Amino acid sequence: MNRKGLSLKSRVRSGKNRTEVVGYMHHVIALGFFDGVHMGHAALMKRTRQLAEHLGVPSMALTFDRHPDEIVKEIQVPLLNTTDERREIIKKRFAIDEVRFAVFDREMMTTPWERYVEDTLISELGAIHLVVGHDHRFGYMGEGTAEKLQKLCKSRGIGCDIIPKVELNGVTVSSTYIRSLIAEGDAERAAQYLGYRHFITGEAIPGRGIGSKALYATANIAMPKALVSPAFGVYATRVLVDGAVYDAVTNIGRNPTVGETPSVSVESHLLGFSGDLYGKTLRVFFYKYLRKEQKFPNVTALKAQIAEDIKNAQAFLSAAPPPEIV
C-alpha cells in the first residue's frame, strides 16, 4: 500500500494517449529542488515534457516543500520563489502537467536513496522515465547520484536522462549564483540566467501615509522573509495588478529619509495609475537597478530625486519587453 492507502498493484487501464493505473498514472518525472526555475532547469523541464508527449503519459515535476539544508544543515536558505510561484512558473513556462511538493523532514533525510526510488518514484508515483540534472544528489547522506539513479533505473526497465550543466557567458547557471546577483542588485543579469524577470509577489498593505501626502503615492508590500532580498535601492520595475501591467519605480529598503522602518518594505509608484490598491495582490518585476537607497536632507530633496528616478525608469522601460510570468 502507498501512503494514500492505494494498492500499488492496481489493475492497468489504457487511455487514449496514456497508460493509466487505478489510483495513479504512469509519469515522466523531473527531479530537483528547482529554486528559481532558471535556464538550467529549463533544459530539464523541456526534456521532461518532450518525453511525456512521446510516451503518451503525464509529465510531473517532483520537488520539496523546503530547501533540504533547512533540515540537513539547520540553516535558512533565502529562496528565489515561494512554493506557489515555483508551481506557477513550472506550469506556465513549460506546460508540465503536475507539480508535487514532497515533505522534506528527518524521515526523508534518512531514507536510503534506493528505497526512495523504489517506494516513492516507481511504486507510488508510477515513474516510467526520470529526468535529473548532472549534479542531482538525494537520499541519506546524499549518497544517491544521477549516475547511480540511471544504473538502477536501467535494471528496472525505466528510462533516466541526465541533463548536462548549462552555461551562459562562461558561468554555470545555478540558483546560488542567481541569488548572489539579486542580492547585489543586478536585476538585468539575473533575468538572463532565470530566463524571465525576477519578481516578488505580495498583498498591498497600508504604509505610513507619508508618500501619498508629501511625495508620490506608493503601493507597499512586505518583503517575504523566506526570499532573498534584492539589494536596497531604487529599481525600474513593472507591476502586475488585477490583470494589468504598469510601468513603475520601486524602492526596496527602510526609507531612511522619512524615518527608518523596522522591516524591509517594497514600495512601488505605479505610473499612470490612480486608485486604492490596499488588499490587492501585486507582482513586482525587477528590470534595472537605478541607484542605491540613500538618506536625503529633507523631503523636498527626496521628491526631486524621485522625479529623476521616474524619468530614468521611463527611458529604460520604453524599450523593454513585457514581463514573462503574468
Task: Give the positions of each predicted feature.
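Positively charged, low-complexity intrinsically disordered leader regions
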Residues: M1-L31
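Phosphate/ribose-recognition catalytic cores of enzymes acting on nucleotide-derived substrates
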Residues: R3, G207-V326
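Generic structural signal for residues in well-ordered beta-strands
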Residues: S10-V12, V99, C160
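N-terminal catalytic cores of NTP/NDP-binding nucleotidyl/phosphoryl-transfer enzymes
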Residues: E20-T82
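Residue-level signal for inorganic ion chemistry
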Residues: H38, I90, L130, A190, ...
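A structural preference for short, hydrophobic beta-strand core positions in alpha/beta folds
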Residues: A61, F101, I162-I163
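N-terminal Rossmann-like or analogous alpha/beta NTP/dinucleotide-binding catalytic cores
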Residues: P68-R156
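Glycine-rich, Lys/Arg-enriched anion-binding loops that position phosphate/diphosphate groups
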Residues: C153-G253
